[in-house]
Amino acid sequence: YEMSASLVGSEMCIRDSLKAGDAFSDFVGPLGCPSELIHEDIEELKKQKIVFIAGGVGTAPVYPQVKWLHEHGVDADVIVGAKNKDLILLEEEMKAVAGNLYITTDDGSYVRKGMGTDVLKDLYAQGKKYDKCIAIGPLIMMKFVCLLTKELGIPTVVSMNPIMVDGTGMCGACRLQVGDEIKFACVDGPEFDGHLVDFDQAMKRQQTYKTEEGRAMLAALEGETHHGGCGNCN
C-alpha cells in the first residue's frame, strides 16, 4: 500500500521521526463508501466525457480512480492544481493513465499560472464538453469548482474531507449539510453531489480544532517549555 498525507500541527513531527518499515498506531481507513464509478456500467462510462479536478493532496485519491477507469478502457481528462511545482503529486503516474493531463500552479512555477477552474474555463472556451466532473481537494477549491460546473451544467461529484474523529458517525465531527439532509462523511461519504453540499458550513466546521492543532504543534516543538494557554501564538 502507498499513503499520501497532509501533515497538520504536531503531525509534522512524524515526517522526521518515521522511517520506511516503521509502524504507528491509531490509524483507520478506508472510511465510508467506495467510488460510485464502480457501480456504473462500463459501457455507459465509455460513452461519457469525464474530467477530474484535483487540488493538492487531492491528486492522491484521484489517481486510483483514473487508473481504474483506464484499466477498463475509459480515458478521463485530469486537471491537477497545486500551490507550486514542489507540491505536484504523481505527475508521471497520472500521465500514464489519463486521457489528457492539465497542470496548473497558483504561483505559475510550473506549466501555467492559475486555478483548476481557470483550466476548465479555457477547455470549454476551446470547445471541450464534459458529462461528469469529479473534484477532490481543499474545501474552498471544491466550492469554486462546483460553482463553475453548475454554471456550465456539468453534474459534479465531490469527495469531502472533513475532520473525522471516530470514523463511525457517532462523534459528529464530519457532519455535512447536503441539500435538505444531514450526512456524515465517514459513513455516508466521502462522495456527494457537489451542487448540494453546503461548503460554507463545511469550511466553518473545519476550523473546529484549529486552536488545538496550533497548541499541539507548539507542544511538539517546544516540549515542556511552552505555555500555550492564551492561544495567541498558535
Language model feature labels by segment:
Residues 24, 76, 125-132, 156, ...:
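Short secondary-structure transition/capping segments
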Residues 8, 99, 121, 150, ...:
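A generic structural signal for secondary-structure junctions
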Residues 1-9, 13-14:
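Single conserved hydrophobic/aromatic residue that forms the stacking wall/gate
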Residues 184-188, 192-234:
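Short Fe-S-cluster ligation motifs
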